[in-house]
């Protein structure tokens, strides 16, 4: 039996970021069932940073993460975590009221937010079909996130603090014994006073193993594809383009273009694969909105995004199980919120108040707590 202060189940962005901040305060062991961390969600993300997206809780967590992303600790990564990538939300359905609503809510958080007419939007992304565009919002503060550098930085930090990240360690049995949690894997057994459930789409399954009431987590599939831009088209400096009704998005990606129908199809937690219909839908919508022709995607994939009923993230102790801490329901926001979410989770696990710089963004324990979901 290997002893630790904190056992974290799941080495995706939720478990990695929480373990990173916890590792300064005790021995952390992260148990990951796959051969590599982040296989199901983190490694399949489009990874874009924008404050003007998501629920108020998500926006607060995203804003509170920016300082860490802009100035990570020395040695955390070898190059910047963020690179400029503005976001342009385009109205293709002639819905000026919704465009104005999104502009005003975004500008309250991002003073640099601009409202564009159709000509301005088309000048920024010249392949847009002018007759299909009715206006846009433009957030110049958006950025691409180097997901791998961020994720690996968290995992390295755990190891530097004498923690362990153990892949191919699936939790087979979880028991509460003499005031501690014991987790049995094929490769060995582990014990700690605190068990952090950061298993992504499998969080409810882990709770079931532990005899803890589930959150009602719903995994959802999102499909995406990569395709080449037309010859002679330089798309490097295009913004991330999102349709106002969130029916698709398009963004430059290492000289190629990444597209998605922005689907959120309820599924069981599994090694999700893209559906041909999803990919075809995304291609059709992009071709309808732009002059781009997508002959055949270079690569297609799908990832899992997991939600609870209110769409917010969860960080807090279970009401009915001592020492069982949820870090769950990252939805599509886990990477852009990871710095604040990891630091907040680590504080709450240790029964400490949230750090002042997180509270300054309007975050508090109650808005993260799983108890808000109780009937």
From Swiss-Prot:
GO biological process, alphabetically ordered: arginine catabolic process; arginine metabolic process
Record-annotated disulphide pairs: none
Keyword Oxidoreductase: yes
Activity control: Inhibited by D-arginine and D-lysine at high concentration.
Entry's EC annotation: 1.4.99.6
Induction: Induced by growth on D-arginine, D-lysine and 2-ketoarginine (2-KA), but not on L-arginine. Repressed by DauR. ArgR could be a transcriptional activator of the dauBAR operon in response to the presence of L-Arg.
Enzymatic class: oxidoreductase
Cofactor: FAD
Quaternary structure and partners: Monomer.
Entry similarity comment: Belongs to the FAD-dependent glycerol-3-phosphate dehydrogenase family.
Protein name per the record: FAD-dependent catabolic D-arginine dehydrogenase DauA
Gene name linked to the record: dauA
């Amino acid at each position: 039996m290997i002893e630790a202060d904190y056992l974290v189940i799941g080495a995706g962005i939720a478990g990695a970021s929480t373990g990173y901040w916890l590792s300064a305060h005790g021995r952390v062991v992260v148990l990951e069932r796959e051969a590599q961390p982040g296989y199901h969600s983190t490694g399949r993300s489009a990874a874009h940073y924008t404050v003007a997206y998501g629920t108020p809780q998500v926006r607060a967590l995203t804003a509170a993460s920016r300082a860490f992303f802009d100035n990570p600790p020395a040695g955390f990564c070898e190059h910047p975590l963020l690179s400029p990538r503005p976001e342009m939300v385009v109205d293709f359905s002639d819905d000026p009221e919704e465009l104005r609503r999104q502009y005003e809510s975004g500008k309250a958080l991002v003073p640099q937010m601009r409202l564009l007419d159709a000509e301005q939007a088309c000048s920024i992304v010249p392949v847009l079909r002018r007759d299909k565009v009715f206006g846009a919002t433009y957030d110049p503060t958006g950025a691409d996130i180097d997901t791998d550098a961020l994720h690996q930085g968290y995992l390295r930090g755990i190891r530097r603090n004498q923690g362990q990240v153990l892949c191919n360690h699936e939790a087979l049995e979880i028991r509460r014994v003499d005031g501690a949690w014991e987790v049995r894997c094929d490769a060995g057994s582990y014990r700690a006073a605190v068990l952090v459930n950061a298993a992504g789409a499998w969080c409810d399954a882990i709770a079931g193993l532990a005899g803890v009431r589930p959150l009602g987590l719903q995994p959802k599939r999102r499909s995406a594809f990569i395709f080449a831009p037309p010859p002679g088209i330089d798309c490097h400096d295009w913004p991330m383009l999102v349709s106002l009704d969130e029916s698709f998005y398009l963004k430059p990606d290492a000289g190629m273009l990444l597209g998605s129908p922005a689907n959120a199809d309820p599924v069981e937690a599994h090694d999700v694969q893209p559906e041909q219909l999803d990919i075809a839908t995304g291609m059709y919508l992009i071709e309808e909105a732009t002059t781009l022709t997508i002959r055949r995607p270079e690569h297609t994939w799908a990832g899992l995004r997991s939600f609870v009923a209110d769409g917010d993230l969860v960080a807090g102790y279970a009401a009915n199980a001592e020492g069982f801490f949820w870090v769950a329901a990252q939805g599509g926001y886990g990477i852009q919120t990871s710095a604040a979410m990891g630091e907040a989770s680590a504080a709450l696990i240790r029964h400490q108040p949230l750090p002042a710089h997180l509270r300054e963004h309007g975050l508090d324990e109650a808005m993260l707590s799983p108890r808000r979901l109780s009937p």
